[in-house]
């Protein structure tokens, strides 16, 4: 297993980690990406390499006359990235190596066809890659891109112009899009995770006042007055 050193590049919108194997750039990813650990693990298995992280890299021996120099492709990548961020470069001329599934690599190759200063939707990329119904999978493949900026996944946005999902953060994505096409600043909107709405307390139901109908007691039938007794007969007819 070959040991590969990771080099750092400070861009105006975040730190990038760069690495190469046999003269080909295999890593250009954001140091703060939440997917970085998974990306390094995937590349290690696919390319049979062991990454030496910047934090664990051995300190150069000061007695050495010639300290270790980065590979030419790393030097070239840093130079071209500097030109890109200064607005003096629109495309990259760097040998690179992809490491993914056939579907992922089809998506990444489609990303390379997006012109500088343009943006497309995830549905467009899925269709371009030959999988028009796999929009969600295409979005995930963009997230697995290990060569950010070089392979411009930042040019893919939501169908509603929303800046959804990016390894370097939405701020970096907006920065890159504004850098490439300042006149398109207004249409883009940043989609943030809206806090869940607190359930509104149910208002107590209004008590319906029942009209009580007073029942008037039925009138007792009046007692019949005793009739007058006829006078007793005296026997005379």
Placement of each model-derived feature along the sequence:
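Basic nucleic-acid-binding alpha-helical/helix-turn surface characteristic of O6-alkylguanine DNA
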Residues: 1-132, 183-237
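Short glycine/serine-rich loop segments
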Residues: 133-175
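A short, terminal or domain-edge coil/loop segment
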Residues: 118-127, 148-154, 178
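Phospho-regulated, low-complexity intrinsically disordered regions of nuclear gene-regulatory
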Residues: 162-198
């Amino acid at each position: 297993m070959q040991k590969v050193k990771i080099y750092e590049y400070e861009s105006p919108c975040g730190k990038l980690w760069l690495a190469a194997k046999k003269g080909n750039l295999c890593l250009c990813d954001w140091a703060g990406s939440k997917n970085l650990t998974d990306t390094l693990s995937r590349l290690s298995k696919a390319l049979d390499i062991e990454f030496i992280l910047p934090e664990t890299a051995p300190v150069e021996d000061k007695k050495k006359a010639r300290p270790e120099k980065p590979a030419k492709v790393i030097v070239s990548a840093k130079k071209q990235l500097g030109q890109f961020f200064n607005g003096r470069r629109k495309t990259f001329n760097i040998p690179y190596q992809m490491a993914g599934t056939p579907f992922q690599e089809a998506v990444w190759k489609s990303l390379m066809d997006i012109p500088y200063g343009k943006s497309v939707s995830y549905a467009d990329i899925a269709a371009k890659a030959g999988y028009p119904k796999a929009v969600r999978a295409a979005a995930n493949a963009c997230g697995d891109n290990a060569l950010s900026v070089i392979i411009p996944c930042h040019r893919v946005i939501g169908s509603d112009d929303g800046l959804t999902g990016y390894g370097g953060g939405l701020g970096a994505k907006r920065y890159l899009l504004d850098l490439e096409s300042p006149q398109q600043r207004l249409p883009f909107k940043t989609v943030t995770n809206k806090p869940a709405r607190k359930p509104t307390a149910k208002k107590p139901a209004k008590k319906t006042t029942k009209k009580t109908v007073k029942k008037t007691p039925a009138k007792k039938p009046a007692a019949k007055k005793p009739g007058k007794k006829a006078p007793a007969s005296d026997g005379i007819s």
